[in-house]
């Protein structure tokens, strides 16, 4: 009788340990999900910022080209004089 009680107590302890481990892992999974969501949001924000910077860069390049064309035209006129 005491042998089976001992085995039962060991089994109960192992089951409790497994439950505790599962609970901790579930908590860790939730934390990782939250971190993943946060990082996904940061990636999205970074992509939007990059797109905005690319648009601004293209606009500035267009302006630079416009100024270069004007400068070339002015230099051409000066050579004529």
Swiss-Prot record:
Q: Which UniProt keywords apply?
A: Acetylation, Cell cycle, Cell division, Coiled coil, Cytoplasm, Septation
Q: What protein name applies here? A: Cell division protein ZapB
The annotated regions of Polar residues compositional bias extend over: 37-47
Region described as Disordered: 36-67
Q: What does this protein do?
A: Non-essential, abundant cell division factor that is required for proper Z-ring formation. It is recruited early to the divisome by direct interaction with FtsZ, stimulating Z-ring assembly and thereby promoting cell division earlier in the cell cycle. Its recruitment to the Z-ring requires functional FtsA or ZipA.
Major location, coarse class?
cytoplasm
* Modification type N6-acetyllysine: residues: 10
Localization per record: Cytoplasm
Would you identify the family this protein belongs to, as annotated? Belongs to the ZapB family.
GO MF terms here are: identical protein binding
Coiled coil spans: 5-81
One BP annotation, GO: FtsZ-dependent cytokinesis
A Gene Ontology CC term for this entry? cytosol
Assembly with partners or alone: Homodimer. The ends of the coiled-coil dimer bind to each other, forming polymers. Interacts with FtsZ.
Q: Which domain of life is it from?
A: Bacteria
Q: Where is the composition biased (Basic and acidic residues)?
A: 48-62
